[in-house]
A protein has these predicted regions:
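A short macromolecule-binding patch
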Residues: 198-217, 252
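Short aromatic-glycine-enriched beta-strand elements
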Residues: 185-194, 204, 251
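Short nucleic-acid-contacting surface segments enriched for D/E, G, S/T with interspersed K/R
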Residues: 213-237
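Structural detector for short beta-strands of small beta-barrel domains
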Residues: 171-187
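Active-site histidine-anchored catalytic micro-motif
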Residues: 110-144
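Domain-level signal for Mg2+-assisted phosphodiester chemistry and nucleotide/NA-binding surfaces
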Residues: 1-93, 121, 136, 144
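OB-fold/S1-family single-stranded nucleic acid-binding modules
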Residues: 241-261
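C-terminal helix of von Willebrand factor
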Residues: 151-175
Length: 261
């Protein structure tokens, strides 16, 4: 039995594009690695001062915390602190990074596999320490993910590509993927798309011709700008259709634009 722990930096995930994240799917993602979840911690900020003054705000925040708890996550709440900087401005701060790192290190003795939910590069040393102790560490994040952190983990899951992790805004059937092959001479590419929650649940045969792609900002599509989608690992959103030969292709493709909170 592979014993797993989940450690989610909620503030980072929500702030960087994970608003509306389905916590049940996070658990399913770990279970798809043939692991049994022993620990599931969600680290969140709590602004007690504001909640005391704003009943509406308090109600919404409590409903959100209750929803996370219903998915069997243990909540670790970090109180928001307020202080004045040198210019007299009031600054708010609630950083749960240290709490998450300490808990992960202490609880890792009884775990084989850890899913870290954050794009914060400050967790680089935590990941390396856990790996040096023989643990497999995977990463789940959205936008603004530290490249150093992403390269250090054993497997990286982009939250935008995990099926069902985020709610569909308009119940659209559009897919998301990344370009992994580009033929500049013939102007086509192949996209890789997640088909499930397992590490290898990926199909990489989705054909995309440059003529089926449009930049979201309206600028002309060139070989160079099309190729940059691969080098910059941009997420591409598209409709998937079956060709007459039974293969699949992407049409009405464009850059995916996440909704930031």
């Amino acid at each position: 039995m592979i014993k797993a722990g989940i450690f989610l930096d909620i503030e980072n995930l929500v702030r960087c594009g994970g608003w509306g994240i389905r916590y049940r799917v996070v658990r399913e993602l770990v279970e798809a690695q043939e692991a049994t979840i022993l620990r599931a911690n969600a680290y969140m900020a709590i602004d007690s001062e504001r909640e005391e003054k704003d009943i509406d705000y308090q109600r919404k925040k409590q409903e959100y915390r209750d929803a996370v708890r219903r998915e069997s996550f243990h909540l670790v709440l970090k109180k928001v602190q307020r202080y004045r900087n040198s210019e007299g401005d009031i600054i708010t701060k609630a950083n749960a990074d240290l709490d998450l790192a300490i808990d992960a290190l202490l609880q890792a003795d009884n775990l084989d596999y850890i899913l870290l939910g954050s794009g914060d590069g400050d967790f680089f040393r935590l990941v390396r320490t856990l790996q040096n102790r023989g643990k497999r560490v995977d990463l789940l994040s959205f936008s603004n993910t530290s490249e150093i952190l992403r390269c250090e983990v054993d497997n990286y899951f982009s939250g935008y590509l995990v099926p069902g992790l985020l709610p569909s805004i308009d119940n659209s059937s559009r897919k998301r993927g990344v370009m992994h092959v580009f033929n500049e001479e013939k102007g086509f590419a192949f996209l890789a798309v997640r088909t499930g929650l397992g590490v290898l649940d990926i199909r990489d045969d989705v054909f995309c011709h440059i003529s089926d792609f449009r930049h979201r900002d309206g600028r002309a599509v060139t070989d160079q700008s099309f190729a940059q989608l691969k080098t910059q690992q941009k997420i591409i959103e598209f409709e998937l259709v079956e060709r007459s030969d039974g293969k699949v292709k992407a049409i009405n493709a464009t850059e995916f634009e996440p909704e930031m909170k």
